[in-house]
Structures are given as structure tokens and as C-alpha cells.
Regions:
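Short, Lys/Arg-enriched N-terminal segments with co-localized hydrophobic residues
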Residues: 1-10
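Short, low-complexity intrinsically disordered segments
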Residues: 9, 102, 106, 141, ...
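Short, compositionally biased
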Residues: 12-153
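Intrinsically disordered, low-complexity polar regions and short flexible loop motifs
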Residues: 156
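Short aromatic/basic micro-patch
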Residues: 159
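C-terminal, surface-exposed recognition/capping segments
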Residues: 162-208
Length: 208
């Protein structure tokens, strides 16, 4: 399974909205004048409000749109990028809509580096760094890193850690309900983690 971390994404949205608010104040515009301007540009004011609520209102199963909106509803005309998988304080993970059946490493890569890592993004990059140095394959990690579908930026997705897969499993029902509504692959079966288990093994997680 491929996931992305929404923390920076949400922070960027908040920063942009704060900049807009600062500009409105600097220009001496009233909130009504600002709304009228955006309405004239065919930007729904309700979308801005919903984006403001993202940081405190995100729940597992919500849809993450490529244009920046996070909503509990499927909105016609907008492209869904991922589904929120877990919300743990300020740590928000989202499940991408496509998956692949690949080996962890067809070369039996021994990275000996990710056993204690709880963050899949860091672990994925470490695995790929070592695989390049050793000139050995790390297919699952590489596929996740290269993922660039539905608006996901290449390099942002990663192979989740064992800890992160456990978080997704806790919210499996909500995630799968949204994935099913989109016609995407459900969280079912066995999934590789980026967490190593011993010298030449890695943890698998059963989503059944």
C-alpha cells in the first residue's frame, strides 16, 4: 500500500489562507468585499471555509482532493487524490488510490537501517539510498516513491512503516467505505512495511 503524509500539505494551506487574510487587511477590504471578489472569480467561498477547517476537522475516510480540499463527500468535477487513513494528533496520513503486488526486494537487500524507524517516509528513503549504494533492488519502496497518480507529487508517497500500517488497520472500515465508493482497491490481504525484521526480512501486515 502507498500512503502520503498530509502534515506539510495542511500547513501550506493554512499559510496560504493566512497570507490571503493578511492581504485583505492590508488593502483595507471588508470580508464581504473579499468574498465578492472570489465569487466573481468562480471560487466558492464555502470551499475556503472548508479548507480553514481541515487542520482541526480531518477524520479517517475523508476524501483528499488534488485541488487542496479535504471533504467527507465525493464532489463531482473534482479529482480525488487519496483517502485520509489516520489522524494522530498533528500526524495525518492518507491512503493513495492505487496499489501494486511487488517483492520487498528481489535481491534480498540487507539494509539493516529501518528496524526502529516509525516513519515510513524516512524509512523508504533510507532503503532506497542503501539499495542504490549496493546496486540491489527494493521494488516495493521504489514503486511507492515513484508514485505520481491522481495529483500526488512524485517523491511524496512512501511505503508505510509497521506502526503506520497498524494505524490504518484501526481505521480500516472508514477507509474501505470511501475506497469502495471510488471504485478503488480496498485494504485487504497482506502488505509490506518499510520496517525490517532481522538481517534479511521485513514485516508484513495482514489487513484481513
Amino acid at each position: 500500500e502507498t500512503i502520503i503524509n498530509l502534515n506539510n500539505y495542511i500547513m501550506n494551506k493554512k499559510e496560504k489562507l493566512e497570507q490571503v487574510n493578511h492581504l485583505v487587511q492590508k488593502l483595507g477590504l471588508s470580508p464581504q468585499e473579499a468574498v465578492e471578489y472570489f465569487s466573481a472569480k468562480v471560487v466558492e467561498s464555502s470551499s475556503v471555509v472548508r479548507e480553514c477547517e481541515v487542520a482541526v476537522g480531518v477524520l479517517p475516510g475523508m476524501y483528499v482532493y488534488a485541488d487542496g480540499l479535504i471533504s467527507s463527500e465525493i464532489i463531482e468535477g473534482r479529482r480525488v487524490m487519496a483517502v485520509v487513513g489516520s489522524v494522530d494528533g498533528s500526524d495525518v496520513l492518507a491512503v493513495c488510490l492505487h496499489e501494486a503486488c511487488l517483492p520487498w526486494s528481489s535481491d534480498w537487500l540487507e539494509a539493516k537501517a529501518t528496524q526502529e524507524m516509525t516513519g515510513g517516509k524516512e524509512a523508504t528513503r533510507k532503503l532506497l539510498e542503501i539499495s542504490r549504494k549496493k546496486r540491489q533492488e527494493a521494488e516495493a519502496a521504489q514503486w511507492c516513491y515513484d508514485y505520481a497518480e491522481d495529483g500526488v507529487i512524485q517523491g511524496e508517497a512512501f511505503l508505510p512503516s509497521l506502526t503506520e500500517l497498524e494505524k490504518l488497520f484501526a481505521n480500516k472500515a472508514a477507509i474501505n467505505a470511501s475506497l469502495k465508493a471510488l471504485g478503488a482497491a480496498l485494504l485487504e490481504g497482506w502488505y509490506w512495511s518499510s520496517t525490517e525484521n532481522g538481517s534479511n526480512h521485513a514485516w508484513l501486515f495482514n489487513m484481513f
